[in-house]
C-alpha cells in the first residue's frame, strides 16, 4: 500500500492533481479551489443569459472563455480554471465538469444537456480507495464536435475533431476525427 503522508519535495497536492499524479483530494488548497468554484456555480445556477452578472460569473468560473461561447445554467465544475473552451461553443444546461485534470473543448462545439466530463480516476486497489486519493487525466474535445444529451466522457479521453457522440453514450476510449 502507498504511503500518502510522504510528500514529494516542492510539489503541492494541487500540482500533483494537475500533473496526473496520485494526490490527496482533501488537501486544504484543493478544497479551497473546489469551494470557490462551488460558490460561483451556485451563483450562476439562479441566473439566465440575460442576467446582468451572467457573463462576469461565467468568466470568473472559466477564465478566458470567449465572449462567443455560451453556458446555459445550471453548470457545475470542481475548479473551473482547468477548463478551456474554444470560440462559438455552446454548452447546454446541467453540464458537469470535474476538472481536476484539464478539460479542453474546441471551437464550434455543441455540448448537449446533462453531459458529464470526469477527469478523476479513483485507485483500482480497494485498500488505496479507502484513502482520500485519486489521479486526474485530461479530456480533450476537438473542434466542431457534437455531444448529444447525457453523454459521459471518462478520464483521459480525446474526441477527435468533427466527431458526433450519440445521446446517452459513455465514452471510455479515444474517438478518432470525423467519427
Please place each PLM-identified region on the residue numbering:
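Flexible, glycine/small-residue-enriched loop-and-beta-strand segment within the central core
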Residues: 52, 75-85, 90-159
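Conserved beta-strand-loop-alpha-helix hinge in the C-terminal portion
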Residues: 177-179
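Short glycine-rich loop/turn motifs that provide flexible caps or phosphate-binding loops at active sites
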Residues: 19, 147, 155, 165-167
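C-terminal/domain-terminus segments
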Residues: 159-174
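Terminal amphipathic alpha-helical/low-complexity segments used for targeting or macromolecular assembly
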Residues: 1-68
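Short secondary-structure boundary/capping segments
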Residues: 14-15, 61, 131, 138, ...
Amino acid at each position: 500500500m502507498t504511503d500518502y503522508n510522504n510528500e514529494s519535495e516542492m510539489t503541492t497536492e494541487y500540482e500533483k492533481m494537475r500533473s496526473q499524479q496520485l494526490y490527496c483530494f482533501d488537501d486544504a488548497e484543493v478544497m479551497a479551489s473546489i469551494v470557490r468554484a462551488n460558490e460561483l456555480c451556485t451563483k450562476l445556477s439562479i441566473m439566465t443569459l440575460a442576467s446582468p452578472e451572467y457573463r462576469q460569473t461565467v468568466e470568473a468560473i472559466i477564465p478566458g472563455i470567449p465572449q462567443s461561447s455560451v453556458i446555459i445554467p445550471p453548470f457545475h465544475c470542481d475548479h473551473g480554471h482547468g477548463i478551456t473552451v474554444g470560440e462559438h461553443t455552446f454548452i447546454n444546461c446541467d453540464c458537469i465538469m470535474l476538472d481536476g485534470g484539464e478539460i479542453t473543448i474546441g471551437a464550434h462545439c455543441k455540448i448537449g444537456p446533462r453531459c458529464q466530463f470526469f477527469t478523476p480516476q479513483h485507485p483500482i486497489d480497494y485498500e488505496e480507495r479507502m484513502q482520500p486519493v485519486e489521479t486526474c487525466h485530461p479530456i480533450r474535445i476537438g473542434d466542431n464536435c457534437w455531444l448529444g444529451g447525457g453523454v459521459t466522457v471518462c478520464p483521459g479521453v480525446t474526441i477527435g475533431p468533427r466527431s458526433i457522440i450519440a445521446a446517452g453514450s459513455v465514452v471510455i476510449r479515444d474517438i478518432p476525427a470525423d467519427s
